[in-house]
Amino acid sequence: MNERRYDIDALRAIAMFLLIFYHLGISFTSVAPYIAFVQNKRFNDGIWYLLSVMNSWRIPLVFLISGIALRLAFQRRTKIEMFKERTKILIVPYIFGSVTFGAASLAIAFTYYEGWSDEYLWLWVITIFDGIHLWFLKNIFIYCLILIPFLNLISNKTAKETIFSKILNMPGGVFLFSIPVILEGHLLNANAYSEVVNYGRSYQEYANTSHGFLLGFIWFFLGVLLVSQGEVFWESNKRNWKTHLFVGFACYFYRFFNNFEDGFSLDNRLISFESFNFIFLMLGLGAVYLNK
């Protein structure tokens, strides 16, 4: 557990690249004007075929890796040090990025579509609370505040065999950890069109929704819990990545042939299971090829 995981470093960089690539791709679709993106004059919704491959798991992967990173950092730090460090690496970038890049991106988009207004100079007042593209940093910080006090109970520092490590050693046992993710998908099914709470309408609607917050917490917690099982977790990833590859693409192609662009009509429990498999595919590929 004390060894540095180069695969997690690499996956963190890959996850950030995918976020940037996805947001760049949005500008080439017809969706761009509706979510305050500057739309390219030559847009083509055919790019959704590529974007939809990653759309169900790109954000959950970020939360999982953040949970893994928190647990690995806890091996060498006290809880107080963890609080201070997480405040420094999450809240400072969140505030700075929100009032600068976040506000600027909105001002540019609004100016592009509607023309300049002096009111845009005050957009930072909104973005510091909303976060815009950095909303996930706010969520991760809240998850840290919730879980750091309980890390001693969750983290299994002595690397003893637990019920979770036994499950990971079982053939197909890793799929049991998809249950909370699938249950959240079921919750989304039940509340997608609720007028009482902004739970979220589609699986990919992560930003500033109850769906995105709860799903992010589940993946963050799984990151802490599973990496605490030590080598058993990494060996499970190495052993099962081909299975995750097959199941993930099977779910994706089911979406492909059933109007995958419009996620509103699809069962979110299936999408959540697809997401689970692609995420563990990435973990498996990382454990096999990137931890060097």
Regions found by a protein language model. Give the residues of each.
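Alpha-helical transmembrane segments and their immediate juxtamembrane cytosolic regions
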Residues: 1-292
